[in-house]
Amino acid sequence: MPIQKCKPTSPGRRFVEKVVHDHLHKGAPYAPLVEAKKRTGGRNNNGHITTRHVGGGHKQHYRIVDFKRNKDGVPAVVERIEYDPNRTAHIALLKYADGERRYIIAPKGLRAGDKVQSGNDAPIRPGNCLPLRNMPIGSTLHNVELKIGKGAQLARSAGASVQLLGRDGSYAIIRLRSGEMRKVHVECRAVIGEVSNQENNLRSLGKAGAARWRGVRPTVRGMAMNPIDHPHGGGEGRNKGIQPVSPWGQKAKGYKTRTNKRTTKMIIRDRRVK
Protein backbone atom coordinates (compact mmCIF):
# COMPACT_ATOMS: atom_id res chain seq x y z
CA MET A 1 0.00 0.00 0.00
CA PRO A 2 1.32 3.52 -0.75
CA ILE A 3 2.58 5.81 2.01
CA GLN A 4 0.86 9.20 1.79
CA LYS A 5 2.58 12.33 3.09
CA CYS A 6 0.21 15.10 4.11
CA LYS A 7 0.63 18.69 3.00
CA PRO A 8 1.90 20.96 5.82
CA THR A 9 -1.36 22.91 6.20
CA SER A 10 -0.68 23.07 9.96
CA PRO A 11 2.18 22.13 12.30
CA GLY A 12 0.30 18.98 13.27
CA ARG A 13 -0.08 17.84 9.64
CA ARG A 14 3.49 18.57 8.58
CA PHE A 15 4.97 15.26 9.74
CA VAL A 16 1.96 12.98 9.21
CA GLU A 17 2.66 9.92 7.04
CA LYS A 18 -0.16 7.42 6.69
CA VAL A 19 -0.73 4.17 4.85
CA VAL A 20 -3.56 4.23 2.29
CA HIS A 21 -5.83 1.16 2.44
CA ASP A 22 -8.41 1.38 -0.32
CA HIS A 23 -9.65 -2.18 0.21
CA LEU A 24 -10.92 -1.65 3.78
CA HIS A 25 -14.64 -1.66 4.56
CA LYS A 26 -16.01 1.88 5.01
CA GLY A 27 -19.07 1.03 7.12
CA ALA A 28 -19.74 -0.17 10.66
CA PRO A 29 -18.48 -3.53 11.98
CA TYR A 30 -20.66 -6.66 12.12
CA ALA A 31 -22.78 -5.94 15.22
CA PRO A 32 -23.23 -9.51 16.61
CA LEU A 33 -19.42 -9.82 16.88
CA VAL A 34 -18.92 -6.49 18.68
CA GLU A 35 -19.00 -5.95 22.43
CA ALA A 36 -18.33 -3.12 24.87
CA LYS A 37 -14.77 -2.42 25.94
CA LYS A 38 -14.26 -0.91 29.36
CA ARG A 39 -11.22 1.32 29.81
CA THR A 40 -8.93 0.86 32.81
CA GLY A 41 -6.68 3.92 32.49
CA GLY A 42 -3.81 1.61 33.44
CA ARG A 43 -5.30 1.02 36.92
CA ASN A 44 -6.02 -2.26 38.68
CA ASN A 45 -9.01 -3.09 40.90
CA ASN A 46 -7.44 -1.10 43.77
CA GLY A 47 -7.11 2.02 41.63
CA HIS A 48 -3.31 1.80 41.59
CA ILE A 49 -1.41 2.45 38.36
CA THR A 50 -0.06 -0.89 37.12
CA THR A 51 0.63 0.17 33.51
CA ARG A 52 2.08 3.63 32.99
CA HIS A 53 1.40 5.88 30.00
CA VAL A 54 -2.16 4.57 29.47
CA GLY A 55 -5.36 6.60 29.62
CA GLY A 56 -7.87 8.64 27.66
CA GLY A 57 -8.32 8.10 23.96
CA HIS A 58 -11.28 7.55 21.69
CA LYS A 59 -13.99 5.13 22.77
CA GLN A 60 -13.55 1.70 21.18
CA HIS A 61 -15.64 -1.42 20.70
CA TYR A 62 -14.01 -4.83 20.90
CA ARG A 63 -14.28 -7.09 17.86
CA ILE A 64 -14.54 -10.78 18.84
CA VAL A 65 -11.81 -12.47 16.77
CA ASP A 66 -11.66 -16.24 16.24
CA PHE A 67 -8.13 -17.34 17.19
CA LYS A 68 -8.97 -21.06 17.44
CA ARG A 69 -10.17 -21.61 13.84
CA ASN A 70 -11.88 -24.85 14.91
CA LYS A 71 -14.70 -24.88 12.34
CA ASP A 72 -13.16 -27.72 10.35
CA GLY A 73 -14.31 -28.82 6.92
CA VAL A 74 -16.70 -25.89 6.42
CA PRO A 75 -15.52 -23.53 3.65
CA ALA A 76 -15.87 -19.79 4.19
CA VAL A 77 -15.90 -16.76 1.93
CA VAL A 78 -14.28 -13.45 2.90
CA GLU A 79 -17.07 -10.85 2.96
CA ARG A 80 -14.82 -7.86 3.67
CA ILE A 81 -11.57 -6.66 5.23
CA GLU A 82 -11.97 -4.23 8.14
CA TYR A 83 -9.95 -1.87 10.32
CA ASP A 84 -9.72 -2.92 13.97
CA PRO A 85 -8.84 -0.21 16.55
CA ASN A 86 -7.77 -2.86 19.08
CA ARG A 87 -4.82 -4.24 17.08
CA THR A 88 -2.32 -3.25 14.39
CA ALA A 89 -3.44 -5.97 11.98
CA HIS A 90 -6.58 -5.82 9.85
CA ILE A 91 -9.40 -8.30 10.37
CA ALA A 92 -11.48 -10.25 7.84
CA LEU A 93 -15.18 -11.07 8.20
CA LEU A 94 -15.83 -14.65 7.08
CA LYS A 95 -19.19 -16.12 6.08
CA TYR A 96 -19.22 -19.91 6.40
CA ALA A 97 -21.28 -22.21 4.20
CA ASP A 98 -23.70 -22.84 7.09
CA GLY A 99 -24.35 -19.08 7.47
CA GLU A 100 -22.21 -18.37 10.54
CA ARG A 101 -19.92 -15.33 10.48
CA ARG A 102 -16.62 -14.94 12.30
CA TYR A 103 -13.77 -12.44 12.39
CA ILE A 104 -10.19 -13.63 11.81
CA ILE A 105 -6.83 -11.87 11.58
CA ALA A 106 -6.47 -10.97 7.89
CA PRO A 107 -3.35 -12.43 6.23
CA LYS A 108 -1.34 -10.45 3.69
CA GLY A 109 -3.03 -10.46 0.28
CA LEU A 110 -6.45 -11.71 1.45
CA ARG A 111 -9.32 -9.85 -0.22
CA ALA A 112 -13.12 -9.92 -0.32
CA GLY A 113 -14.39 -12.92 -2.27
CA ASP A 114 -11.47 -15.20 -1.41
CA LYS A 115 -12.16 -18.62 0.12
CA VAL A 116 -10.54 -19.92 3.30
CA GLN A 117 -10.79 -23.17 5.19
CA SER A 118 -9.50 -24.89 8.31
CA GLY A 119 -8.83 -28.52 9.13
CA ASN A 120 -6.34 -31.32 8.50
CA ASP A 121 -7.04 -31.49 4.77
CA ALA A 122 -7.22 -27.74 4.05
CA PRO A 123 -5.18 -26.71 0.98
CA ILE A 124 -1.88 -24.87 1.48
CA ARG A 125 -3.09 -21.34 0.75
CA PRO A 126 -2.81 -18.01 2.65
CA GLY A 127 -5.55 -17.77 5.27
CA ASN A 128 -6.05 -21.52 5.70
CA CYS A 129 -5.51 -23.06 9.14
CA LEU A 130 -3.85 -26.46 9.62
CA PRO A 131 -1.93 -28.40 12.28
CA LEU A 132 1.84 -27.94 12.07
CA ARG A 133 2.32 -31.61 11.15
CA ASN A 134 0.55 -30.96 7.81
CA MET A 135 2.53 -27.83 6.91
CA PRO A 136 5.33 -27.96 4.31
CA ILE A 137 8.82 -27.35 5.70
CA GLY A 138 9.87 -23.74 5.10
CA SER A 139 6.32 -22.36 5.21
CA THR A 140 5.68 -18.82 6.42
CA LEU A 141 3.05 -18.91 9.16
CA HIS A 142 1.22 -16.70 11.64
CA ASN A 143 -1.33 -17.14 14.45
CA VAL A 144 0.59 -20.06 15.94
CA GLU A 145 -0.74 -21.94 18.96
CA LEU A 146 1.52 -22.79 21.90
CA LYS A 147 -0.98 -25.20 23.49
CA ILE A 148 -3.22 -27.55 21.55
CA GLY A 149 -6.68 -26.01 21.18
CA LYS A 150 -5.92 -22.90 23.24
CA GLY A 151 -5.90 -20.54 20.27
CA ALA A 152 -3.22 -18.52 18.51
CA GLN A 153 -0.64 -16.76 20.66
CA LEU A 154 2.40 -16.16 18.40
CA ALA A 155 2.74 -13.82 15.38
CA ARG A 156 -0.56 -11.93 15.60
CA SER A 157 0.46 -8.29 15.06
CA ALA A 158 0.82 -6.41 11.77
CA GLY A 159 3.43 -7.90 9.43
CA ALA A 160 4.37 -10.68 11.87
CA SER A 161 5.25 -14.21 10.80
CA VAL A 162 7.24 -17.30 11.82
CA GLN A 163 8.99 -19.88 9.66
CA LEU A 164 8.62 -23.64 10.00
CA LEU A 165 12.16 -25.05 9.97
CA GLY A 166 11.49 -28.74 10.52
CA ARG A 167 9.96 -31.44 12.70
CA ASP A 168 11.53 -33.53 15.44
CA GLY A 169 9.28 -36.33 16.64
CA SER A 170 6.11 -34.84 18.11
CA TYR A 171 7.44 -31.27 17.95
CA ALA A 172 7.83 -28.75 15.15
CA ILE A 173 10.73 -26.28 15.15
CA ILE A 174 9.86 -22.69 14.28
CA ARG A 175 11.90 -19.50 13.99
CA LEU A 176 10.41 -16.22 15.20
CA ARG A 177 11.18 -12.76 13.81
CA SER A 178 13.23 -12.04 16.94
CA GLY A 179 15.62 -14.85 15.98
CA GLU A 180 14.35 -17.17 18.70
CA MET A 181 14.00 -20.83 17.72
CA ARG A 182 11.58 -22.95 19.71
CA LYS A 183 9.66 -26.21 19.69
CA VAL A 184 5.87 -26.34 19.36
CA HIS A 185 3.74 -29.49 19.37
CA VAL A 186 2.87 -30.68 15.86
CA GLU A 187 -0.85 -30.81 16.74
CA CYS A 188 -0.86 -27.06 17.42
CA ARG A 189 -2.46 -25.05 14.64
CA ALA A 190 -1.17 -22.16 12.57
CA VAL A 191 -2.34 -20.11 9.59
CA ILE A 192 -0.54 -19.93 6.24
CA GLY A 193 1.00 -16.57 5.29
CA GLU A 194 2.04 -13.45 7.18
CA VAL A 195 -0.19 -10.92 8.93
CA SER A 196 -1.62 -8.01 6.93
CA ASN A 197 -0.80 -4.28 7.24
CA GLN A 198 2.95 -4.88 7.12
CA GLU A 199 3.54 -1.17 6.40
CA ASN A 200 2.20 -0.24 9.84
CA ASN A 201 5.69 0.56 11.14
CA LEU A 202 6.24 3.09 8.33
CA ARG A 203 3.47 5.45 9.42
CA SER A 204 4.13 8.64 11.38
CA LEU A 205 1.45 9.97 13.71
CA GLY A 206 2.80 13.49 13.23
CA LYS A 207 1.78 14.95 16.59
CA ALA A 208 1.32 14.04 20.23
CA GLY A 209 -2.45 14.40 19.97
CA ALA A 210 -2.67 11.47 17.56
CA ALA A 211 -1.08 9.27 20.22
CA ARG A 212 -3.55 10.61 22.80
CA TRP A 213 -6.44 9.60 20.53
CA ARG A 214 -5.09 6.06 20.79
CA GLY A 215 -4.96 6.16 24.59
CA VAL A 216 -1.20 6.71 24.90
CA ARG A 217 -0.09 9.25 27.51
CA PRO A 218 3.30 11.03 27.69
CA THR A 219 6.45 9.26 28.87
CA VAL A 220 8.62 11.32 31.22
CA ARG A 221 12.34 10.48 31.41
CA GLY A 222 13.66 9.42 34.79
CA MET A 223 16.54 11.93 34.51
CA ALA A 224 13.99 14.74 34.31
CA MET A 225 12.41 13.72 37.65
CA ASN A 226 13.31 14.43 41.25
CA PRO A 227 15.26 11.85 43.31
CA ILE A 228 12.09 10.89 45.19
CA ASP A 229 10.35 9.92 41.95
CA HIS A 230 13.01 7.89 40.12
CA PRO A 231 16.49 6.42 40.73
CA HIS A 232 17.79 8.54 37.82
CA GLY A 233 16.36 11.75 39.24
CA GLY A 234 18.19 14.71 40.70
CA GLY A 235 21.84 15.62 40.30
CA GLU A 236 23.45 18.61 38.66
CA GLY A 237 22.72 18.80 34.96
CA ARG A 238 22.07 15.64 33.00
CA ASN A 239 23.56 13.22 35.48
CA LYS A 240 22.23 9.67 35.67
CA GLY A 241 24.78 8.44 38.21
CA ILE A 242 23.90 4.73 38.00
CA GLN A 243 23.26 2.06 35.40
CA PRO A 244 19.84 2.28 33.70
CA VAL A 245 17.06 0.97 35.93
CA SER A 246 13.28 1.07 36.10
CA PRO A 247 11.44 3.40 38.52
CA TRP A 248 11.50 0.51 41.00
CA GLY A 249 15.22 -0.21 40.67
CA GLN A 250 15.19 -3.24 38.36
CA LYS A 251 18.03 -3.26 35.84
CA ALA A 252 16.84 -2.13 32.41
CA LYS A 253 19.59 -3.61 30.22
CA GLY A 254 20.90 -7.16 30.12
CA TYR A 255 18.87 -8.35 33.11
CA LYS A 256 16.89 -11.51 32.37
CA THR A 257 13.35 -11.39 33.73
CA ARG A 258 12.16 -14.78 32.49
CA THR A 259 11.42 -17.23 35.34
CA ASN A 260 9.24 -19.86 33.63
CA LYS A 261 11.60 -22.82 33.81
CA ARG A 262 8.83 -25.22 32.78
CA THR A 263 8.80 -23.95 29.18
CA THR A 264 12.44 -22.88 28.90
CA LYS A 265 13.24 -26.36 27.57
CA MET A 266 11.13 -25.52 24.49
CA ILE A 267 13.49 -22.68 23.51
CA ILE A 268 16.29 -23.99 21.29
CA ARG A 269 17.97 -20.67 20.52
CA ASP A 270 17.58 -17.55 22.65
CA ARG A 271 16.57 -14.37 20.87
CA ARG A 272 19.43 -12.47 22.55
CA VAL A 273 22.10 -14.62 20.90
CA LYS A 274 23.57 -12.76 17.94
UniProtKB/Swiss-Prot annotation:
SMART domains the UniProt entry points to: Ribosomal_L2, Ribosomal_L2_C
GO annotation terms (biological process): cytoplasmic translation
Region named Disordered: 38-57, 224-256
The keyword Chloroplast belongs to this UniProt entry's keyword annotation: no
Pfam family, one: Ribosomal_L2
Any GO MF annotation of the entry: rRNA binding
Record-level GO cellular component terms: large ribosomal subunit
UniProt feature, compositional bias: Basic and acidic residues: 229-239
Highest rank taxon of the organism: Bacteria
Keyword vocabulary terms for this entry: Ribonucleoprotein, Ribosomal protein, RNA-binding, rRNA-binding
Residues annotated as signal peptide: none
Quaternary assembly: Part of the 50S ribosomal subunit. Forms a bridge to the 30S subunit in the 70S ribosome.
Purpose of the protein: One of the primary rRNA binding proteins. Required for association of the 30S and 50S subunits to form the 70S ribosome, for tRNA binding and peptide bond formation. It has been suggested to have peptidyltransferase activity; this is somewhat controversial. Makes several contacts with the 16S rRNA in the 70S ribosome.
Record family assignment: Belongs to the universal ribosomal protein uL2 family.
Name assigned to this protein: Large ribosomal subunit protein uL2
Source taxonomy: Bacteria, Pseudomonadati, Pseudomonadota, Gammaproteobacteria, Moraxellales
